[in-house]
Amino acid sequence: MGGHYMKSVLFVGHGSRDPEGNDREFISTMKHDWDASILVETCFLEFERPNVSQGIDTCVAKGAQDVVVIPIMLLPAGHSKIHIPAAIDEAKEKYPHVNFVYGRPIGVHEEALEILKTRLQESGENLETPAEDTAVIVLGRGGSDPDANSDLYKITRLLWEKTNYKIVETSFMGVTAPLIDEGVERCLKLGAKKVVILPYFLFTGVLIKRLEEMVKQYKMQHENIEFKLAGYFGFHPKLQTILKERAEEGLEGEVKMNCDTCQYRLGIMEHIDHHHHHDHDHDHDHGHHHHDHHHDHHEDKVGELK
């Protein structure tokens, strides 16, 4: 095989149709400050090359025996739970001699909260003594995965704990409720005279541009209310700290998986078949059966990394 790389880390960015939303530049900075014996490669889920399979091919071609795949995604959702594991499953068949470890997305992390606090401060907010009638809306993309949606609520709650705002609400840009219009209405009903919207997005892309237009509309609709759009989460230096931590967990074989993650991949087929009723209780034999079936790249490979 040649090459002195035995271990590699493959970062998976989302990719974007919008060149301004491109995470390529940030991802290339992730290649610095590593142990020289570790190969660091990058790839993208969609819109850009290399894709995940090509990224894995590159790692193996350069001699990697262990490939740790890290999703650069804020919350665990469809892409991180289904699409990337599917590419890893294919790679395991193609390269039976290589160990694959799948790391965690950014998720609920102390440094992520620090980044959100920084974005609020940059917008001119005083987190220690905010005005009583100032509300903050933590705004996510929104999706069909309850795990990701509820994680955003947890992040909102932790932000409330770590600041002195009386009103901190959660809203989504699409797919699920409460949508941002509802979030704004709720803040106003609670007596807010100022509403700060804090986007929990990794990169600009089309959503931020749409959001800027929406904020203009809110200002026109509610002339006596101050609306402020804080900077989006973005590629902050602290994000590198989180991603490095996720990579190190993978390299050391200490990936802490969320069990819901496994159940979700099984449940997706039920959703498609319309068998996903509200009276289900996520019975555990589903989850564990699923562990054996799909997530063997956690179970049998993690322990082998030395």
Curated annotation (Swiss-Prot):
Residues 297-306 have a biased composition (Basic and acidic residues). Pathway: Cofactor biosynthesis; adenosylcobalamin biosynthesis; cob(II)yrinate a,c-diamide from sirohydrochlorin (anaerobic route): step 1/10. It is an enzyme of class 4 (lyase). It catalyses: Co-sirohydrochlorin + 2 H(+) = sirohydrochlorin + Co(2+). Its EC number is 4.99.1.3. CDD domains: CbiX_SirB_C, CbiX_SirB_N. Co(2+) binds at residues 14, 79. Binds 1 [4Fe-4S] cluster per dimer. Residues 276-306 are annotated as: Disordered. One of its GO terms (biological process) is cobalamin biosynthetic process. One of its GO terms (molecular function) is sirohydrochlorin cobaltochelatase activity. Its cofactor is [4Fe-4S] cluster. Coiled coil: none annotated. Residues 287-296 have a biased composition (Basic residues). [4Fe-4S] cluster binds at residues 259, 262. Keywords: 4Fe-4S, Cobalamin biosynthesis, Cobalt, Iron, Iron-sulfur, Lyase, Metal-binding. Signal peptide: none annotated. Chelates cobalt to the cobalamin precursor as part of the anaerobic pathway to cobalamin biosynthesis. Belongs to the CbiX family. CbiXL subfamily. Homodimer. PANTHER family: SIROHYDROCHLORIN FERROCHELATASE, CHLOROPLASTIC. This is Sirohydrochlorin cobaltochelatase. It comes from Priestia megaterium. The lineage of its organism: Bacteria, Bacillati, Bacillota, Bacilli, Bacillales.
